[in-house]
């Protein structure tokens, strides 16, 4: 599919860089450049107990679905809104095709494209990708922040943006003038000179690039999101590096208390106005350097051998009790992030001492050993409340008793009882896949391992239950459960 797009996109640069050779299209009140494909969309499974993400219909496999028309109010030729949410690559190709169409219609037209979305959604990446292909001028809204007004390291308040300067810059560029614009480098204000390239394309990227004051200046508008959950992780990981804060929990606190409330209030409403809407499926967990490798098996299946092995260690196991709350993310429309996909869920672990730890992870099955890239750190009750205020909901609670029998050389062997499953498990964890596999072979569990997560097994058990109340999990069922089991949470 991507090759078909690329062969078509390869012509764009020549269209944009040699505009004198481009012929105008026929003047008509409404122009259809590509016949839209028939839509046969199915509503994906809204059931929270679903074990896998919904499968998207394969759209746009043959052609780009782009429509153009004359605006009856302005008299300008413009791109109609694409009525579907696109993948990152699809959105990139559609944006480039939209530029090509406008250029074909009026070779002298200066085209301004705006890209908006939450922090970490991929705005800069998309802008650079489009800019490199069409030789466009890229402007970041972040450079127009009034540094003297920044307080508490909050760069995300729209009142900090010098919109007057942004608007005057765009207008002057449209008049083919050379302009001096600000440039923030290491939190210090510098400046740079820019002018239009021969392609006559301006790309403005930033959280507020589709705000009401800027939209009238845009010829093409693009909204990009990755679901609050993925954006949250990406923001944490980037913030740890760039913010100068001491820990990831400080960054998370800032995001839950400042960044995403700002997004919900000031950015999200403008994204609905975009002509092209993109849902980025980039997985930030792939950036984690040291994943945890896990192998587990049911204890009762080989109880006698396990007991002999554990006894041979000649240790008194360390016993710990945990309560794991699983939060599923808020939803971005019908084509947004799947709440049913357990890979999108966040685990909040409460220890017997009242401490909370948050874990973002994906578990990938690979033979007898699962690979679990993860991000884990301690949080406060206030931060947990911040996540709930962003729209996260409690989907399940699993209580476990853990006996740590071995913890040496980076390998941990535990015997765990999951109350809700009413089963014991032997589990091996470590940062070396080879060492985890060696330990699993010694315990003779490589052929009897359980690859599924405890969360998956929990929902599988609920499905089999004859109790109609559990045939389909509803948020209220679990919310009432946590209130009952954690009455002392407010006292922490």
UniProtKB/Swiss-Prot annotation:
<comment type="pathway">
    <text>Pyrimidine metabolism; UMP biosynthesis via salvage pathway; UMP from uridine: step 1/1.</text>
</comment>
<comment type="function">
    <text>Catalyzes the conversion of uridine into uridine monophosphate and cytidine into cytidine monophosphate in the pyrimidine salvage pathway.</text>
</comment>
<dbReference type="GO" id="GO:0043771">
    <property type="term" value="F:cytidine kinase activity"/>
</dbReference>
<dbReference type="Pfam" id="PF01928">
    <property type="entry name" value="CYTH"/>
</dbReference>
<protein>
    <recommendedName>
        <fullName>Uridine-cytidine kinase D</fullName>
        <ecNumber>2.7.1.48</ecNumber>
    </recommendedName>
</protein>
<keyword id="KW-0808">Transferase</keyword>
<comment type="pathway">
    <text>Pyrimidine metabolism; CTP biosynthesis via salvage pathway; CTP from cytidine: step 1/3.</text>
</comment>
<dbReference type="InterPro" id="IPR027417">
    <property type="entry name" value="P-loop_NTPase"/>
</dbReference>
<dbReference type="GO" id="GO:0044206">
    <property type="term" value="P:UMP salvage"/>
</dbReference>
<dbReference type="GO" id="GO:0005737">
    <property type="term" value="C:cytoplasm"/>
</dbReference>
<dbReference type="InterPro" id="IPR006083">
    <property type="entry name" value="PRK/URK"/>
</dbReference>
<feature type="binding site">
    <location>
        <begin position="117"/>
        <end position="124"/>
    </location>
    <ligand>
        <name>ATP</name>
    </ligand>
</feature>
<feature type="domain" description="CYTH">
    <location>
        <begin position="290"/>
        <end position="460"/>
    </location>
</feature>
<dbReference type="InterPro" id="IPR023577">
    <property type="entry name" value="CYTH_domain"/>
</dbReference>
<feature type="region of interest" description="Disordered">
    <location>
        <begin position="36"/>
        <end position="56"/>
    </location>
</feature>
<keyword id="KW-0418">Kinase</keyword>
<dbReference type="GO" id="GO:0004849">
    <property type="term" value="F:uridine kinase activity"/>
</dbReference>
<comment type="similarity">
    <text>Belongs to the uridine kinase family.</text>
</comment>
<dbReference type="Pfam" id="PF00485">
    <property type="entry name" value="PRK"/>
</dbReference>
<dbReference type="GO" id="GO:0044211">
    <property type="term" value="P:CTP salvage"/>
</dbReference>
<dbReference type="GO" id="GO:0005524">
    <property type="term" value="F:ATP binding"/>
</dbReference>
<keyword id="KW-0067">ATP-binding</keyword>
<keyword id="KW-0547">Nucleotide-binding</keyword>
<feature type="region of interest" description="Disordered">
    <location>
        <begin position="468"/>
        <end position="492"/>
    </location>
</feature>
<feature type="compositionally biased region" description="Low complexity">
    <location>
        <begin position="468"/>
        <end position="483"/>
    </location>
</feature>
